[in-house]
Amino acid sequence: MTSALMLIDVQRNMLEPPTPVPAAASIREALQDLLLRARGAGALVIHVQNDGPPGEPDEPGTDGWQLVFPASAGELIVRKDQPDTFAANPALAKDLAAKEITEVVIAGMQSNYCVAESSRGALKHGLQAILASGAHATYDENEPASAISAQIERELAAEGVSVLSFRKVSFDEAS
């Protein structure tokens, strides 16, 4: 299998003050670890950037909208304005197929929104989806963020997404 890393909404508004997700520092370290290993393996890296509506912290052009980890040469930046990256970018699955990508490692924010929906979108388009446990996060809602993320992992695993510790994820080089 040829792997790609999809970093979803790894934007300043989620990982930096004033509105970071709980455990932002450890999530950032996990995301950086995945990114460095993907780059080291020559895997394709896809940075997904959410375009929030006017006035939101991720409104295009604002500081909160900026990527935490700038894209390197050859890496893709795709923008979206809905939870499923694939629905927002109809050509993405075909572009990945053209690059012989069969597996997408998914990490980022928020577990119960864009991470979950993009994982489902990957499956819908015939890709193997791997959710990097420990490298996705959300905000506290009716229960702690960690409980929400764990529930999403269980739900996605039941739907066919592989859930693997970010430390155990390996990457195969893109052709």
How should each PLM-predicted stretch be described?
Residues 3-4, 32-40, 58-175:
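Active-site-adjacent betaalpha module
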Residues 50-51, 109:
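Short, well-ordered beta-to-alpha junction loops that form the rim of enzyme active sites
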Residues 5-10:
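N-terminal nucleotide-binding beta1-loop-alpha1 segment
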